[in-house]
């Protein structure tokens, strides 16, 4: 069990790839309501650590606690369910989908079963509220790099990510 004061704790996290140890017994604790930045040289393991936290990779050893409870982050869906989100440096967007469709990817209900109109309205509201101008009906391939970055940010706002 972790400390409830922390939004997330990563303890003794190790991740190996063939020929390299990407994360070697890393510890990270982030208090609720605080802002942290990971800094380091290329290849230092920052992205690996964040990919573990968001369920894209599994650690070889170590444990993760979210809000004081041990968490098994076996997939991005598991991380999303715990309120963990990440604005990716390399966008994880489907080019042929709309902004609104991309925002709903990975959520609990299948995309084809969703009525997109309320989602588009909410995306437009978040876009306006946070000054992140983007058209919810635009296809990703139609957007500039800056607009695609805004979609990644709006995705986390829409999902109410806590971490």
Report each predicted region and the residues it spans:
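Glycine-rich phosphate-binding loops of nucleotide-dependent enzymes
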Residues: 1-163
């Amino acid at each position: 069990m972790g400390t409830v004061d922390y939004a997330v704790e990563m303890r003794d996290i190790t991740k190996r790839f063939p020929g390299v140890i990407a994360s070697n017994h890393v510890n990270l604790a982030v208090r609720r309501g605080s802002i942290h930045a990971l800094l380091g040289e290329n290849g230092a393991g920052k992205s690996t650590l964040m990919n573990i936290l968001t369920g894209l990779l599994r650690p070889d050893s170590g444990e993760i606690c979210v809000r004081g409870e041990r968490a098994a982050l076996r997939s991005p869906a598991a991380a999303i369910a715990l309120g963990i989100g990440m604005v990716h440096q390399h966008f994880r967007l489907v080019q042929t989908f709309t902004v609104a469709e991309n925002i709903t990817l990975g959520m609990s209900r299948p995309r084809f079963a969703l009525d997109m109109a309320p989602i588009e309205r909410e995306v437009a509201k978040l876009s306006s509220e946070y000054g992140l101008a983007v058209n919810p009906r635009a296809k990703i391939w139609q957007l500039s790099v800056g607009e695609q970055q805004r979609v990644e940010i709006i995705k986390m706002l829409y999902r109410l990510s806590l971490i």
